[in-house]
């Protein structure tokens, strides 16, 4: 499973690079958290770079467009996400998950899936914060104050949501795997589906 900025929406001038890297990694299925199918068609019509690889996946039914907003605590977000995760169950990887920047919506979804597969707080945080280093040069070594502020404001809210901890509640002893399961089962995903999803994401 990979995450990136959009490989098709080039508003930040990253799409050609994201698409090239995803293709080189052998990505076979894309979970597009940001766009509608109509928006994807519009990107094809206005593309100023080679969209052949992305369009071949799309035409084969290997791109799921979820059109999520950034409110991962909202019911609509969770319902739409589950629809996309069911598509992952039905398709072989490697998988690419992206929104526009690959930061907010993608950061939450990847942390949720990492938690589901048994990742620790530190593992989820370290993966999430790579984005802030890539975009803004914010990392623990060179800019610890800003790094800690982003973790406190952004990532810890994600961690609380996944763990089912109230806003500003303590994360001590949080069970992220159990919380991730509950986040998904609360909107109708079955235990069988969750286990199949984990199998897809962790198989070699």
Regions found by a protein language model. Give the residues of each.
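Ser/Thr-glycine-rich phosphate-binding loops at phosphate-binding pockets of nucleotides
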Residues: 101, 105-106
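Cys-dependent protein tyrosine phosphatase-like superfamily
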Residues: 1-96, 108-204
